[in-house]
Amino acid sequence: MTSLRRKARIAALQTLYEIDCTEHKAEDAVIHSTTEQSLSQEAISFTEKLVQGVLKNKSKIDEVIGRFAPSFPVAQMSVIDRNILRVAIFEILMDNTPVKVAINEAIELAKIFGSDSSPRLINGVLGSIVTKYGKASHKRPKEGKWQPSLKN
């Protein structure tokens, strides 16, 4: 059985994919993806939180991706991989999701929706971010304490 939060993450990924590939408004894309999956109100709220959080912080998140995946420019990365990373990085940096959960969920989404190499890419990028900033304790950094610099 798929958890409520996994279903919400799937809907968020589908929403972000739709927004990335079309000119659709975020609100319309959220309605489309959550209606398709018949999500509960709690799952819809979590989906909206993820989508809004990623969109609000997209440029900062994309800078982090670029820093830790220099061989894979964000614009050239597959739409699925790019948005899986965006959701996971949002959850790690700006949400209450434990680091281990965010990474595991991202890898599972990569296995379901990505290519054969997606889980390895996702794990490598997220693992590098966590290792660089010493957050391997699998706990979210305290508010305002973890603002990754894009410098070495």
What are these regions, as identified by a protein language model?
Residues 1-119, 123-152:
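N-terminal interaction/assembly modules
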